[in-house]
């Protein structure tokens, strides 16, 4: 504002709410940005956020500028077991044992980190695990649900689904093998004849479940699921995660096949990763602008720029995958997509922006000791923002 005559270009400011929840503010802003882009013939260069950043590990003295952002999926396992009375425990199949095996296999396992250009996501971690038994009784649970927070740098929804289907198949079979070992030992101890337990490891995606049920019910299933989805949307006592689970439970309940199975699907929300690879002209321009801003800023802080903002943010909605197969897998395996959960995918694809975060530095986010470092936050970060913006807008960047 002190040198307006030197400023070339435009800044569009969006004040968005709900970033910590479902990004409702950003998801409402995206269509407006896309509309302005078309009607005003604007050429957007980048999407900038000023979200909080902190040390990435104990003793980390770096102050980061992030070009790109991590993505988030929530692969979910709806596990159908076989109910039985606790007095006949080997006649049933406990779904909790299967979810426990999956947790042991996946939770915080670096095998499932996503790596791009040497930058590594945090491994998946459990966000919900519970059985669906509504009350206490001496009957074991019939079903259970489990989902993970799964961070991505380059993996797509269809790839993560395929990976998790493989995990579910592996873990289900391990549970069956373990149960048969335990049952054999029990039979020997109690002098009973051993007969191998009848369970088969079966896994399918939500899309495959839907196809199987539709083969039995025909096109009537589409209307039934739409009506159920709208009824779930009308309920104010449950959130989107629960709605998705209840819809899967409903569709499975319509199927004639009642044998144990694991249904793998995606629970909302979905945050696409934005990988600024440097292949497009916009990518190259943003990377150059940030590099010049970082190298020209005189400070005692060690400034470092990295490819992925490591925390979930609204930056994810500045772009979306364009491969129709990826979008198809996302929609068909996210229960309720288009009714109680939706994304402005076409507008996100139209924006297709490289993104960056230059924010305040602080510690202990979401704790009563949360605080910021004043000098970096109010002196250095604003300078980096200013220089990056000016570098992008000027033909002769400073």
List PLM regions with ranges.
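Acidic/histidine-rich catalytic neighborhood of metal-dependent amide-processing enzymes
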Residues: 1-68
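Alpha-helical metal-binding/catalytic segments enriched in His/Glu/Asp
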Residues: 1-26, 75-79, 86-109, 148, ...
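Short glycine/proline-enriched loop/turn "hinge" motifs that connect secondary-structure elements
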Residues: 4-6, 65-72, 136-142, 254-257, ...
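Extended hydrophobic secondary-structure segments that form protein cores and membrane-embedded regions
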Residues: 11-17, 47-49, 127, 262-266, ...
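An acidic- and aromatic-residue-enriched active-site/binding cleft used to recognize and process polar
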Residues: 16-19, 51-53, 80-82, 267-269, ...
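Flexible loop/turn segments at secondary-structure boundaries
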Residues: 20-24, 54-57, 85-86, 154-157, ...
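Midchain, well-structured core segments that form catalytic/ion-binding scaffolds
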Residues: 38-246
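An extended, acidic, His-containing surface patch that forms the Zn2+-binding/catalytic region
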Residues: 184-398
